[in-house]
Amino acid sequence: MRIDQRALDQLREVKITRNYTRYAEGSVLVEFGHTKVLCTASIDNSVPRFLKGQGQGWVTAEYGMLPRSTHSRCDREAARGKQTGRTQEIQRLIGRSLRAMVDLKKLGENTITIDCDVIQADGGTRTASITGAAVALVDAMNVLLAQKKIKQDPLKGLVAAISVGMYQDEVLLDLCYEEDSNCQTDLNVVMTQAGEFIEIQGTAEDKPFTRAQSNAMLEMAEKGIAELIKKQQEALGW
């Protein structure tokens, strides 16, 4: 039995609340158990310099944690004057994942910036960020369509992400902080609605994992992501 009494293959309670803030073209509060992330999508009717004149758009992401989103207060990165390597890695992951769901040619010369701000962290902040941000991105693209700034829907399909891990040689789905801190291996998996992989990040913390264990973790991740895609579709009213 797990720390929070879940089954090995059970997600934490997942909530996706759209239109959470007033001004952003897309805004979502996503909750994976006690992990809560505010994801906003903002439209800029221009593109970075390296894309000017190419007739395509761009999707990028930023990620941050509120100072008291964790058990003890962490300094704001702005106060330190630079982002940590972890922050840079996570926001690049979010950006890569979200670009996989968009036909950038159909987006026109528009940029959508995703901001993922962790309000409360209990493991899986990057996977929750991707899952919530995907919904916010859909809403932002629908704004562009409604305003007739683009002619075709750029959406190729939803994406979602989940963590899995090995703990005492058993595969666990959707790790909370305590599980993540004590597991032998943890994997972060990002997949498309079509069941294709975008990213697999895996690290053996305690002891190496076998090919069979890797396959078992990926199968568990596929199951969890399929459930998350359904949650996204429900939130979008599809």
Curated annotation (Swiss-Prot):
Which Pfam family name is an example for this entry?
RNase_PH
What's its job?
A: Phosphorolytic 3'-5' exoribonuclease that plays an important role in tRNA 3'-end maturation. Removes nucleotide residues following the 3'-CCA terminus of tRNAs; can also add nucleotides to the ends of RNA molecules by using nucleoside diphosphates as substrates, but this may not be physiologically important. Probably plays a role in initiation of 16S rRNA degradation (leading to ribosome degradation) during starvation.
Which keywords appear in this protein's UniProt record, sorted alphabetically? Nucleotidyltransferase, RNA-binding, rRNA processing, Transferase, tRNA processing, tRNA-binding
What the entry lists under Gene3D superfamilies is as follows: GHMP Kinase, N-terminal domain
Query: Which residues, by range, are in coiled-coil regions?
Result: none
Say yes or no: keyword tRNA-binding present.
yes
- Provide the family line: Belongs to the RNase PH family.
Q: Which GO terms describe its molecular function?
A: 3'-5'-RNA exonuclease activity; tRNA binding; tRNA nucleotidyltransferase activity
Report the protein name in the record. Answer: Ribonuclease PH
Q: Which domain of life is it from?
A: Bacteria
Catalytically driven reaction(s): tRNA(n+1) + phosphate = tRNA(n) + a ribonucleoside 5'-diphosphate
Q: What is its EC number?
A: 2.7.7.56
Q: Which gene encodes it?
A: rph
Gene Ontology biological process terms in this record: rRNA catabolic process; rRNA processing; tRNA processing
CDD domains to which the protein is assigned, alphabetical: RNase_PH_bact (cd11362)
Binding residues for phosphate, per the UniProt record?
Answer: R86, G124, T125, R126
The organism encoding this protein is Acinetobacter baumannii (strain ATCC 17978 / DSM 105126 / CIP 53.77 / LMG 1025 / NCDC KC755 / 5377)
